[in-house]
């Protein structure tokens, strides 16, 4: 189906709508369309300062672009530089969000912790992701807590006991919220053999 041309539109609603579409396509395994929509979302974000109401776009664009970049890095794909650039732009938007409102802080910390994990910077990844968990708890943001526990669990392949605890917590919180997507992700991670992140210098 044809989708709306957002090229002349302005405002947070545009970036948010594009980010939602990008995530939907990623979940449907249409990575090419997910990337195209995410890049459009980044353009929409760049039209002005990051505002509070842009938090869905900031969060979802990171959630789409970071795994695409990680897969490209693992597969030595030709478009890895493009995906890296897009993912880091999304993370910078998340950081801007975290600088202007508290709810952006766990989003930013989780994004940059994931970047560090992708680059093989384990200590930095663990610190940022642990801070994301703490901030989500402090702000009473259970959905962010579940996602931060998932991200930290992914970053702890060499600590199976703590990894399992975090993933079980993510599953419990997600189930309580009725969020089957994150509950299923936690279950999948609990049943797979953890692997170390791709080593790469920044």
Where are these regions (language model features)?
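Helix-coil-helix junctions within alpha-helical repeat/solenoid scaffolds
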Residues: 1-201
């Amino acid at each position: 189906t044809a989708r709306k041309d957002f090229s002349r539109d302005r405002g947070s609603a545009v970036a948010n709508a594009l980010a939602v579409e990008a995530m939907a396509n990623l979940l449907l395994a249409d990575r090419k369309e997910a990337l195209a929509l995410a890049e459009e979302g980044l353009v929409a974000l760049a039209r002005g300062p990051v505002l509070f109401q842009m938090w869905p776009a900031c969060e979802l664009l990171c959630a789409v672009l970071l795994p695409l970049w990680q897969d490209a890095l693992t597969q030595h794909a030709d478009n890895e530089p493009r995906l890296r650039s897009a993912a880091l732009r999304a993370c910078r938007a998340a950081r801007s969000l975290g600088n202007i409102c508290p709810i952006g802080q766990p989003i930013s910390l989780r994004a940059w912790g994931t970047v560090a994990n992708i680059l093989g910077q384990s200590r930095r990844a663990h610190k940022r992701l642990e801070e994301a968990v703490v901030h989500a708890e402090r702000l009473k943001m259970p959905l962010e807590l579940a996602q931060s526990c998932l991200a930290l669990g992914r970053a702890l392949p060499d600590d199976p006991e703590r990894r399992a605890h975090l993933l079980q917590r993510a599953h419990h919180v997600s189930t309580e919220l009725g969020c089957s997507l994150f509950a299923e992700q936690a279950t999948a991670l609990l049943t797979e053999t953890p692997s170390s992140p791709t080593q790469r210098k920044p």
